[in-house]
Each structure stands twice: as C-alpha cells, then as structure tokens.
C-alpha cells in the first residue's frame, strides 16, 4: 500500500505554478508509487479525490564529482488534476 512517506516533494517551478492555477498539482515520488496508490494517499491525507492522474518516470542524472562518475536517484513525477473547485489547504508556493 502507498504511504504519505512515498511522496518526496511537491514541485514548485514556473511551469508547475501555472499548472496549479488550473487545478493541477505536480508531485515527486519514489519510483514504486502507482497512480492508484497516489489517489489513495490524496483521499486519505488531503481529503480530495483526484479526477485525473498522469505519471512519468524520470531517470536520475549522471554527474561527475571530483573525477568520479555518480548517478542521482531515479524518481517518478505525477500530475494530479483536482476536481473543479477543490483545493488543498496550505498548498501554495
């Protein structure tokens, strides 16, 4: 079962702030999170049932540090569309 701890961050960028004005929240999660799991988390913890959830899997970037090659962690990003008129309290940039 999905848990609130699987949500790593709510993303705040220029693009996501524009989307928030249209009722779409962008969430970064662990790679094991599923669409249905995220819907359950939003219903249980935020009291809102999303009308639509889109997801994408993002590979971590390969970076160099002091001559050694490393890789950042992979993550999933979800675009959560809230129903018309629904909002989540204390969720603003």
Swiss-Prot record:
It comes from Aliarcobacter butzleri (strain RM4018). Pfam families: Ribosomal_L23. This is Large ribosomal subunit protein uL23. Coiled coil: none annotated. The keyword Ribonucleoprotein applies. GO terms for molecular function: rRNA binding; structural constituent of ribosome. GO terms for cellular component: ribonucleoprotein complex; ribosome. One of the early assembly proteins it binds 23S rRNA. One of the proteins that surrounds the polypeptide exit tunnel on the outside of the ribosome. Forms the main docking site for trigger factor binding to the ribosome. InterPro entries: Nucleotide-bd_a/b_plait_sf (IPR012677), Ribosomal_uL23-like (IPR013025), Ribosomal_uL23/eL15/eS24_sf (IPR012678). It comes from the Bacteria. Keywords: Ribonucleoprotein, Ribosomal protein, RNA-binding, rRNA-binding. The keyword RNA-binding applies. The gene is rplW. Part of the 50S ribosomal subunit. Contacts protein L29, and trigger factor when it is bound to the ribosome. Belongs to the universal ribosomal protein uL23 family. One of its GO terms (biological process) is translation.
């Amino acid at each position: 079962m999905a848990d609130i701890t699987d949500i790593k961050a709510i993303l705040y960028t220029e693009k996501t702030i524009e989307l928030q004005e249209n009722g779409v929240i962008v969430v970064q999660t662990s790679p094991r999170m599923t669409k249905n799991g995220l819907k359950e988390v939003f219903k249980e913890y935020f009291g809102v049932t999303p009308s639509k959830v889109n997801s994408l899997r993002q590979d971590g970037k390969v970076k160099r540090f002091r001559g050694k090659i490393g890789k950042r962690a992979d993550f999933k990003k979800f675009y959560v569309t809230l129903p018309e008129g629904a909002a989540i309290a204390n969720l603003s940039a």
